Amino acid sequence: MLKKLKCKKDMSQIVVGLDIGTTKIACFVGKKNEHGKIEILSMGKSESLGVMRGMVANIEKTVQSIRTAVQEAQSRVDGELTIRVVNVGIAGQHIKSLQHRGIYTRNAFEDEISQKDIDALIEDMYKLVMQPGEEIITVLPQEYIIDSEQGIKDPIGMAGRRLEANFHIITGHVGAVLNINKCVQKAGLEVKDIILEPIASAESVLSDEEKEAGVVLVDIGGGTTDVAIFHEGIIRHTAVIPFGGNV
């Protein structure tokens, strides 16, 4: 039996994922446990009637499929739950990735590097100029360089003046992202975050040891195939191939 939500304060620990696929739309409801891991409370799914190769082709049909999946997920929770905010997975043939190095010069090298410094470096990546019609969806740090010292995975607390980082940047078509947002909003939901599906799949099934040793994840869906490559614990490449099990 699914675990019952004990009280209202538990709602702050609820996480909802929405997978808008070519053949089905799935809604997962999870709750963070005392170890910070996600326990699945319920799942709902519906036939995907308005999506082709990971991209929305019919707004109204996609909205109806989303509503059906969300309502089913809500009904299967042992306790009252109203889903309002979702994390949406994104894929589709419009998704691309690129590598870029960012540089952030700090005012005082003797001060410890903080999360604020890292956030400033990441924020600069979102200001990169993309091709017309494309936008940056996600910026993933790979490794950091402090005053020419390379291979640093966590620079917080270290000293240095010049902070650099190699980034894996995910881009997508503005129209495709807007259509996903529009479908979710018309279904009465709010988008908390948009997550690249190969990354979400990797976090679900790959261990830290596998990522460190080197691994390729291949997720064959109905209309697309997602690929993610890890080595030394770092995301090296992602891709969405516009062919799947039904194509």
Where are these regions (language model features)?
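Nucleotide/phosphate-binding catalytic cleft detector across ATP-hydrolyzing
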Residues: 1-24, 28-217, 234-238, 245
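A structural feature that tracks compact, well-ordered secondary-structure segments
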Residues: 226-228
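A cytosolic small-molecule/anion-sensing beta-strand core signal
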Residues: 231
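Short, glycine/acidic-enriched loop or turn micro-motifs at the edges of active sites
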Residues: 22, 221-224
